[in-house]
Amino acid sequence: MNAIDLFSGAGGLSLALQESGFTILMANEINERFAQTHKLNFPTVPLIMKDINSVTAEEIRALIGDVIVDLIVGGPPCQGFSVFGKRRFINTQDYDPHQDPRNFLVYQYIRIVKELRPKFFFMENVKGFTNLDKGLFVEEVKNQFRALGYNNIWCEIVCAADYGVPQERYRMFMIGNRLGIDYEPPSQTHFPMGTGKLPEYTTVGPAIMDLVGKENQIPNHVPLIHKPIVEARYGYVKEGCKLNVNDLPPELAVATRRDSKTGKVSNYSHVFKRLDRNRPSTTMVPGHNAFPIHPTLNRTLTAREAARIQTFPDSHIFCGTRQEQCIQVGNAVPPRMAEPFLRKIKQYLEHEEEMK
C-alpha cells in the first residue's frame, strides 16, 4: 500500500506511515529547514519543496508514475483554526474563517485529493477546526470531499494519551474514503489514572528521565541557557504546577519583560509550568520559549526531550537551530498517535484488495 504526505513537516506522519507498513511515494513541504529534516530521515522519499498552491498533479505524477494512490495524508497549517491563531484578530467575534488566508491551504489539500483520487484520505488539524463558524466550516470541508465521491467520512477529536503518547494533546482526525467503507477507529489503548482501567496513561518520567546527565551527548539534546533570574524563578515552580507569582521573593518578582504593565512577572501558563513525572505532559507548543519546565531541573525541555514526549525515536534527527528544532517538534503529529489509525486504513485497503 502506498501513500503521499502533504505538509510533511519534520515527518511525524511519514514516520507513522512507515511504521504502519505504507510505502511513501512522495512528500511536500514548503519550509526549507523542515524539508531538510524530512530528507535526512527519509532519504529515499522524493520531496517537492515548494508552496502547495503551485504543486500540480502533473508534477506529482512525474515523480510517482501512474500508480494508484491508496492514501493521502496531511495536516494543512492550522494557525487560523487555533485559539492562539484567532487571537491575532482584535475582535474574534468578527472572525471569518473563510477570509483568513491561513485557512486556504485546506482547500489546496482538497484540490490534490481531487486530482489524484486516492482511495482514502487522512487529514489532521487542531481541535478548534471543528468549532469554527459554529461548526459550519468543518461541514463545508466535509461536503467538498463528499462532492468528490468521498461519502464515508469519520471525523473526531482524538487525545494522544489514549493511544500511548505521554502527552494530553488533542487533534482533529478526519478520515474519508470513496470505497463505501464505514471507518471504525481503533480501540483506545490507554486510560486516565484513577479509572481502574489498564494500562494507564503513559507518563513523562519513563519518556525522558533517562536523558538527565546526557545533555549535549545525543542529537538535539541541548539545553537552553536561561538568564539567572529566570532559572531562579523556575526553582519556585513545584513539580506538576504552574508558577504562583506570590511565592516569589521581591527581587524575583520584578518584571524583566518590556510588555509588563504591572511591573511584576506574569504567569505565562505555557512558560512557567513544570511537568510531573507521574502524569502525561501538556501539549508541546511549538517554539523553544514555549516548552514546559523539566520535572526536576530548572530549565525548559530540550528539543530531544520534547521529541521523546512526541514519541519520536532518538534516531530521528531535527535540523537547524535550537529554535527551529523546537518548532519542528512542536508542530509535528505524534507518530504513535497517528499510527493505529493508519494501520486501520491499511487493513481496510488490504481487505478491499482481497475482495477483487
What is each residue range found by the language model?
Residues 5-12, 66-88, 120-125, 174-178, ...:
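Conserved proline-anchored active-site loop of SAM-dependent methyltransferases
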Residues 31:
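Conserved SAM/SAH-binding beta-strand->alpha-helix loop
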Residues 1-3:
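Extreme N-terminal starter segment of soluble prokaryotic enzymes
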Residues 59-67, 83-265:
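Class I S-adenosyl-L-methionine
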Residues 24-25:
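Short beta-strand element of Class I
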Residues 10-20:
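Conserved SAM-binding loop of SAM-dependent methyltransferases across substrates and taxa
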Residues 36-64:
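S-adenosyl-L-methionine
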Residues 224-356:
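C-terminal target-recognition/interaction regions appended to catalytic cores
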